[in-house]
Swiss-Prot record:
The PsaA/B heterodimer binds the P700 chlorophyll special pair and subsequent electron acceptors. PSI consists of a core antenna complex that captures photons, and an electron transfer chain that converts photonic excitation into a charge separation. The cyanobacterial PSI reaction center is composed of one copy each of PsaA,B,C,D,E,F,I,J,K,L,M and X, and forms trimeric complexes. The keyword ATP-binding does not apply. This is Photosystem I P700 chlorophyll a apoprotein A2. Chlorophyll a B1 binds at H663. HAMAP family: PSI_PsaB. Belongs to the PsaA/PsaB family. Gene3D superfamilies: Photosystem I PsaA/PsaB. PROSITE patterns: PHOTOSYSTEM_I_PSAAB. It comes from Mastigocladus laminosus (Fischerella sp.). Keywords: 4Fe-4S, Chlorophyll, Chromophore, Electron transport, Iron, Iron-sulfur, Magnesium, Membrane, Metal-binding, Oxidoreductase, Photosynthesis, Photosystem I, Thylakoid, Transmembrane, Transmembrane helix, Transport. The gene is psaB. The keyword ATP-binding does not apply. It is a multi-pass membrane protein. The chain crosses the membrane at residues 46-69, 135-158, 175-199, 273-291, 336-359, 375-401, 423-445, 526-544, 584-605, 652-674, 716-736. It is found in: Cellular thylakoid membrane.
Length: 743
């Protein structure tokens, strides 16, 4: 008899019910629990999958390049990037009638196409790509690279090429290689590409495979580098009237610190970005030589973490930052969940920072004027950030349950956090309650007085502290005259600002009023930022409580023996349902989605006003609840509701359909979240009974006995539907409402 799925668990493979499939899906990624898994084997398998992961990413990027080169309008778009819509790919759909074909024939194509809202056209244009041939070459190169990585993944699973456990556990050499190689050298390579290819292309000089070895990126060559006269590379930058992609107004500088934006493209100066990547490369290559390896020189991380020396030589401290870190080296180095938790937290934070910086300081030429792309990229990165952060806390909780050793960590920061968890959790609870009641109280008060026809009775609070911070960065609108908004202040006159390096470009940008840098803020912003604070603190409260109580609580001291996810400990211990670390993750996901919803609503509505030249609507309507419901959500769903109407369809119809479909998926989630096992078991048994007694239908038999989902599984299915529906609904709303206004 053939082995049944799943191969990784003989126990499950022999289960006669449909549990087999569901539990296999649930434990598929829980490699530690698989049959015959050793620690060494686990590390080797995870290592090999990294190659596969990178190969898939290259394959995906290759497909973007290929489809745009084949079916897109890259060469036409370059000629007029502000007015021509970039095409992602063609649409072949046998259901399309004449109206649909006409509606989706857009962007200068003569067949139905999808418009691209990812910003890849702007990126390729900025980094020096100019022809479809460039795109095809990139696609083929990435395809070859993907094959190399797939082979490398396979190779590292062969007995002779499997790294040993000690290799995986040598933290210092890995850190050196990742810092110097992964970050340092790749940043250096990117700086090289910008200097040798992108900057010349932006000045109308083509650099290709045929001439890149013979074309000097700077007229002085390497002489200034070797003679220490580095300032030459910064002199003669592009002028304010430079036309991107031509030599008109172009300079010769390759490494600058101009600050602000290129006036025509409204993106950061390419020469500033090359300088930035070169600086990053230098820092990280130095950092990659700091840690002790076989040569016995450099820092030992274990010694640093265990050290009790003070900052001043001869003094003592409790440890790094005056906090006890002893025992952390082995705890971290021997727990994949600890490592994954920290990496996800770091990556989640960075992803949110990317969302903020991509619109405030756009790096790609003309992307600032592609409003739908700006909205899509901000929303995309903020959504990814919340999921990464949720994962960080989830794996942190699994670490507490599976990997934490109280003896090894006695008296260090982990031990301390566990010992005063009540204080941490109650403070988070207090601040969430405070923010919730006060923020909602203000919104509800304002809502009521507006409804009663006395809007002048609203409680409106100016965000004076935030305005002070904006002013100190150079925003003069508020008249606060502090730091960079005061030409006589020390911030303004200190070197290198006074040396006219970057300050003028920055001040022009922050005070321009047409970009998204330090937006003008008022009472509506004050209120919504307190709503964000409420949502973030509540999400963190649920996650932190779930992680810190994962090993045990007063109610259930032996919780860690039940693992990361368990439904209840039976009727004998009443009240032990819904308190596993998994349940905290489950509840926190709803709050995280709530948070990212409010954040993206705010960002989008605020920007719609700026882009349409009507900031008054946001300022006036955002201070009360009905303003948000009516003037943001309802008013902007008009395009979606009109996707199909009695007169036929238009190119927003696909988003109208997705909007409806998203609601359907979202609503399906409640079926799993609200009705529980007994209902489903009875329903399944009734359906099976009917099936087995229906002619023809009863010729087909399900081999496994149908069993309802467990409570935890039904929650997971419900949560997944809720999340996917939420994402699809807002994505359709965002793109249709923005594209409907700006094309």
């Amino acid at each position: 008899m053939a082995t049944k799925f799943p191969k990784f668990s003989q126990d499950l493979a022999q289960d006669p019910t449909t549990r087999r499939i569901w539990y296999a899906m649930a434990t598929g990624n829980d490699f530690e629990s698989h049959d015959g898994m050793t620690e060494e084997n686990l590390y080797q398998k995870i290592f090999a999958t990294h190659f596969g992961h990178v190969a898939i990413i290259f394959l995906w990027a290759s497909s973007l390049l290929f489809h745009v080169a084949w079916q897109g309008n890259f060469e036409q778009w370059i000629k007029d990037p502000i007015h021509i819509r970039p095409i992602a790919h063609a649409i072949w759909d046998p259901q399309f009638g004449k109206p649909a074909i006409e509606a989706f024939t857009q962007g200068g194509a003569n067949y139905p196409v999808n418009i691209s809202y990812s910003g890849i056209y702007h990126w390729w244009y900025t980094i020096g790509m100019r022809t479809n041939n460039d795109l095809y070459m990139g696609a083929v190169f990435l395809l070859i690279l993907a094959s190399v990585f797939l082979f490398a993944g396979w190779l590292h699973l062969q007995p002779k090429f499997r790294p040993s456990l000690s290799w995986f556990k040598s933290a210092e050499p890995r850190l050196n290689h990742h810092l110097a190689g992964l970050f340092g050298v790749s940043s250096l390579a990117w700086a090289g590409h910008l200097i040798h290819v992108a900057i010349p292309e932006s000045r109308g000089q083509h650099v290709g495979w045929n001439n890149f070895l013979s074309t000097l990126p700077h007229p002085a060559g390497l002489q200034p580098f070797f003679t220490g006269n580095w300032g030459v590379y910064a002199s003669d930058p592009d002028t304010a009237n430079h036309v991107f992609g031509t030599s008109q107004g172009a300079g010769t500088a390759i490494l600058t610190f101009l600050g602000g934006f290129h006036p025509q493209t409204e993106s950061l100066w390419l020469t500033d970005m090359a300088h930035h990547h070169l600086a990053i490369a230098v820092i990280f290559i130095i950092a990659g030589h700091m840690y002790r390896t076989n040569f016995g020189i450099g820092h030992s991380i274990k010694e640093m973490l265990n050290s009790k020396a003070g900052l001043v030589p001869g003094t003592n401290s409790e440890g790094q930052f005056n906090l006890p870190h002893q025992g952390l080296y082995d705890t971290y180095n021997n727990s994949l969940h600890f490592q994954l938790g920290i990496h996800l937290a770091a990556l989640g934070t960075i992803t949110s920072l990317v969302a903020q910086h991509m619109y405030a300081m756009p790096p790609y030429a003309f992307i600032a004027k592609d409003y739908t792309t700006q909205a899509a990229l901000y929303t995309h990165h903020q959504y990814i950030a919340i999921f990464l952060m949720l994962g960080a806390f989830a794996h942190g909780a699994i670490f507490w349950v599976r990997d934490y050793d109280p003896e090894q960590n006695k008296g260090n920061v982990l031990d301390r956090v566990l010992k005063h968890k009540e204080a941490i959790i109650s403070h988070l609870s207090w601040v969430s309650l405070f923010l919730g009641f006060h923020t909602l109280g203000l919104y509800v008060h304002n809502d009521v007085v507006v409804a009663f026809g006395t809007p002048e009775k609203q409680i409106l609070i100016e965000p004076v502290f935030a305005q002070f911070i904006q002013a100190s960065h150079g925003k003069v609108l508020y008249g606060l005259n502090v730091l960079l908004s005061n030409p006589d202040s020390v911030a303004y006159t200190a070197y290198p600002n006074y040396g006219n390096v970057w300050l003028q470009g920055w001040l022009d940008a922050i005070n321009s009023g047409t970009n998204s840098l330090f937006l003008t803020i008022g009472p509506g912003d004050f209120l919504v930022h307190h709503a964000f604070a409420l949502a973030l603190h509540t999400t963190v409260l649920i996650l932190v409580k779930g992680a810190l109580d994962a090993r045990g609580s007063k109610l259930m001291p032996d919780k860690k023996d039940f693992g990361y996810a368990f439904p209840c400990d039976g009727p004998g211990r009443g009240g032990t349902c819904d308190i596993s670390a998994w349940d905290a993750f489950y509840l926190a996901t709803f709050w995280a989605l709530n948070t990212v919803g409010w954040v993206t609503f705010y960002w989008h509505w605020k920007h719609l006003g700026i882009w349409q030249g009507n900031v008054a609507q946001f300022n006036e309507s955002s201070t009360y609840l009905m303003g948000w419901f009516r003037d943001y959500l309802w008013a902007n769903s008009a395009q979606l509701i009109n996707g199909y109407n009695p007169y036929g369809m238009n190119n927003l119809s696909v988003w109208a359909w997705m909007f409806l479909f998203g609601h359907l998926v979202w609503a399906t989630g409640f079926m799993f979240l609200i009705s529980w096992r007994g209902y489903w078991q009875e329903l399944i048994e009734t359906l099976v009974w009917a099936h087995e007694r229906t002619p023809l239908a009863n010729l087909v038999r399900w081999k496994d006995k149908p069993v309802a989902l467990s409570i935890v599984q039904a929650r997971l299915v419900g949560l997944t539907h809720f999340t996917v529906g939420y994402v699809l609904t807002y994505a359709a709303f965002l793109i249709a409402s923005t594209a409907g206004k700006f094309g």
